[in-house]
Every structure is written in C-alpha cells, then in structure tokens.
Design a protein with these regions (language model features):
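Catalytic-pocket segment enriched in acidic/His residues
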Residues: 18, 38-44, 61, 69, ...
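Short, conserved beta-strand element in jelly-roll/cupin
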Residues: 76, 106-111, 199-200
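Short coil/turn connectors at secondary-structure junctions
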Residues: 47-49, 70-72, 79, 95-96, ...
C-alpha cells in the first residue's frame, strides 16, 4: 500500500493512494472514499519528533568523505524542521558553500519502541520511503559536527509516499539523478549494517515514536547541487522523490505563534 499524508477540510490524516484519489485510513473521521486528489493538500509524508540518520553505512561512501569505516552502527540527529515533501524546493542558503545530495532509503516508525532486537524491528516499522540527506559539505568539514551542515530547513526531502508492503530491504537499487544524469548508483546489499540492525542500535539509545524517520545511509557518489537543478532519488520497490533546487530568499521569515 502506498500511504500519503494529506489535509482535507481542516483534518490531517494518512490515506491510501489509489488511481482515483485517497482513501482515509482514519475511519473515525467518516470521510467519503475515495477523496479526489484535486480536493486534497498533499503534505510531507511524516511530521517526525526526530530524524535519525545512519553515518558511513556504505564502505565506499565513508572512504569518499575521509571517515573511518565504523565497526558498529553510528548515527546522528537531523532537525525535524528540515523535512519537505516531493515536489517542494530544496533551498540553498547564501554563503554556505558546497551543498550535496545524499540519496537514501528511509524507514518510518509505526510503534513506540525501545531496546528492540533486529528481528523485532519489522513489526515496529510502518513503512519505507525515499529520502535525501542534503548536506552543506563545506560546513561539515569546517565544523567537524553534523548539526549545522545537515539541519537547514528543506534539507530533508522525503516521499513521495510511504510504501507499507515492502517485505525485504536486502537488495534494493538506490539511484540519485541530478538533471537527469545518474550520480549515485548503489544497492542496499552493500550496507555495512542492515536497516534492522541500525534501528535496533538506535532503539538501545532512545525511544522511537510513531512517525519518527530513520535514514539508513547513502552510497558512494555524493556531489554538489545548485539553484536551478532538479534532484531525483529513486529506490527500487519504494518510489521516486523529486525536488527542484532554489536559492533561499533573503530576509527574515517568521510567524507570530505564541508558545502553547
């Protein structure tokens, strides 16, 4: 099943994507089925409490960025406000230098869990989606940390939907294209740690909540993007994530929303 997150007449809900619209999965709302796409606002597939990203989970990628190959899963956090959906623009901030794409398979947590074994992971995962761990590479090298270089708004495109029927992640082609040219061509079979091993390791550190997003690492072939480009992340049996790249606008942007 391909699941999307939508807004309809003030309600936000998950729905099953069909040829003629979206079937609401929250039957308590009592909505007609299916709802035509033209009547819906398509939202990013998740609004996570946190985004956890695997680091150096492909041997060749670790080599290309000059990091040692880890002997156990390593991971870092990415700001939840970085999430955007398919079709929304990646905004490149002024003065950050080189900005790179990183195509990745991502998992969406379905149940609250902690301290779970690798074998128990599938029962706690809602589904899978495509992700792009956009990274300000010059800042990464300068800071030696990942918070700033990966935390900008729009630096975590995900989508176009959540695939819930994927039973095996062991051999999936992962491709990233920029302006139609293939830049990354990898396979999940080359991961150092499987998605189940990665999720289990994360769960031993922090409680995972429904909707949390886990990125499983990027294969070799990272490279720069710039305003005017189009980036596509394509994962076999999962989907195709498409985002244009634009320059971030000048000036302050804020809304007067009081603390609740």
């Amino acid at each position: 099943m391909r699941v999307v997150r939508v807004q309809y007449k003030g309600s936000v809900f998950f729905g099953a994507l069909q040829d003629d619209g979206v079937v609401c999965l929250n039957h308590q709302l009592g909505l007609k089925d299916p709802i035509p796409l033209a009547e819906l606002s398509i939202l990013p597939v998740v609004a996570p409490s946190k985004i956890i990203c695997a680091g150096m989970n492909y041997r060749d990628h670790a080599a290309e960025i000059g990091f040692p190959v880890p002997d156990e899963p390593v991971f870092f956090l990415k700001a939840p406000t970085a999430v955007i959906g398919s079709g929304q623009p990646i905004l490149v901030p002024q003065g950050v230098g080189r900005v790179d794409y990183e195509g990745e398979l991502a998992l969406v947590v379905g149940r609250q869990c902690r301290n779970i074994s690798p074998d128990a992971v599938p029962a706690n995962i809602f589904g899978y989606t495509c992700a792009n761990d956009v990274t300000a590479r010059d800042l990464q090298r300068r800071d030696g940390l990942f918070g700033r270089c990966k935390g900008y708004d729009t630096f975590c495109p995900v989508g176009p939907w959540i695939e819930t029927d994927l039973s095996d992640t062991a051999n999936l082609a992962v491709r990233t294209l920029v302006n139609g040219e293939v830049r990354q061509q990898g396979n999940t079979a080359d991961m150092l740690f499987t998605p189940n091993e990665m999720v289990s390791a994360i769960s031993r550190v922090m409680t995972l909540l429904p909707g949390d997003l886990i990125l499983t690492g990027t294969p070799v072939g990272i490279g720069p993007i710039a305003p005017g480009d189009e980036v596509r992340v394509e994962i076999e049996q999962v989907g195709l994530l498409i985002n244009p790249v634009l320059a971030a606008p000048d000036g302050d942007e804020h809304a007067e929303v009081p603390l609740q």
